[in-house]
């Protein structure tokens, strides 16, 4: 005839003794038997949390994931020492779950149910990346937009995502643009740019610039610097001078990026490296894999 709290105290003491001895199999057997025989115990979510933790401690992460998820689906939430059991489950699940669809569900639950306990700016970004991995591009763009709207989006340091803001900004802006400046191949882009220089057609050269996030900067600058995004017509840098270009692309070029050395510009740095980049935008198959002129690096390569 023990009341709920007395019963909780006894079960918790027994479970703790198993855990202290690192007898995880004994702990799992004891708690799963208890939950099965006492389906109405108000602390079952906590006993199953201990079960999931025990499985995780033994390296059985898929089984741990099953129990963490089962708690979310079947058990009411419970505060233990001031912490929500459901919150602890979600924290574990985003660490061990490998399936994008599941991870999407868990990130959404964390954002919607526990915004005060998490960094929503980081989670919007991680949610967007999961949607992208799952080819849910419309949802990915919505999540990227929410990330960009956060006041600390430009300054937040997110582990494993050093270019978070730049990549999100580029994707969202690219999606909202005309997307009409790309070339089907790198040789086509290279020849068009060279022809415009050769014929002094600076207006045409300006048209080849990417309409989103085109930059002009030194090799040490950051693409996101406000100064690097300022547009300057190519004619104002040419000023009637004879501009020359290398016969071939720079040796640092690779399958996704290319550099064309040009020189003779009427500016304090007469050498410009034109930066060409392969377009990574699966949302529009017509241009995905095309090439764009994405920016200009000033001066010799470092």
Residue ranges of each PLM-predicted region?
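Alpha-helical protein-protein interaction scaffolds
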Residues: 1-175
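Generic structural signal for hydrophobic core residues of well-folded globular domains
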Residues: 55, 196-197, 209
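Hydrophobic, Leu/Ile/Phe/Ala-enriched alpha-helical segments that form helix-helix packing faces
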Residues: 71, 193-197, 234, 238
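Exposed beta-sheet edge and beta->alpha loop/turn motif
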Residues: 127, 131, 136-137, 242-302
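Short, aromatic-enriched amphipathic alpha-helices that serve as compact interaction elements
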Residues: 182-201
């Amino acid at each position: 005839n023990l009341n709920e709290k007395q019963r909780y105290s006894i079960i918790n003491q027994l479970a703790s003794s198993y855990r202290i001895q690192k007898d995880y199999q004994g702990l799992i057997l004891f708690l799963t038997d208890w939950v099965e025989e006492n389906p109405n115990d108000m602390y079952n979510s906590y006993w199953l949390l201990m079960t999931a933790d025990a499985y995780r401690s033994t390296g059985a992460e898929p089984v741990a994931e099953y129990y963490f998820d089962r708690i979310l689906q079947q058990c009411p939430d419970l505060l233990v020492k001031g912490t929500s059991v459901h919150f602890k489950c979600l924290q574990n699940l985003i660490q061990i779950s490998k399936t994008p669809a599941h991870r999407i569900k868990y990130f959404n639950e964390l954002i919607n149910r526990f915004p005060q306990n998490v960094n929503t700016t980081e989670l919007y970004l991680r949610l967007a990346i999961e949607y992208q991995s799952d080819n849910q591009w419309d949802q990915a763009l919505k999540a990227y937009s929410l990330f960009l709207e956060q006041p600390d989006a430009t300054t937040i340091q997110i582990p494993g995502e050093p270019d978070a803001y730049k990549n999100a900004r580029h994707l969202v802006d690219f999606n909202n643009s005309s997307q009409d400046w790309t070339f089907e191949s790198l040789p086509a882009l290279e020849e068009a740019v060279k022809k415009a220089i050769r014929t002094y057609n600076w207006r045409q050269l300006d048209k080849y610039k990417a309409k989103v996030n085109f930059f002009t900067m030194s090799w040490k600058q950051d693409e996101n610097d406000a100064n690097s995004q300022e547009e300057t017509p190519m004619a104002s840098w040419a000023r009637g001078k004879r501009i020359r270009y290398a016969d071939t692309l720079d040796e640092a070029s690779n399958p996704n990026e290319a550099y064309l050395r040009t020189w003779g510009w009427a500016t304090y740095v007469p050498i410009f490296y034109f930066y060409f980049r392969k377009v990574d935008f699966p949302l529009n198959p017509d241009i995905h894999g095309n090439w764009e002129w994405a920016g200009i690096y000033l001066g010799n390569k470092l």
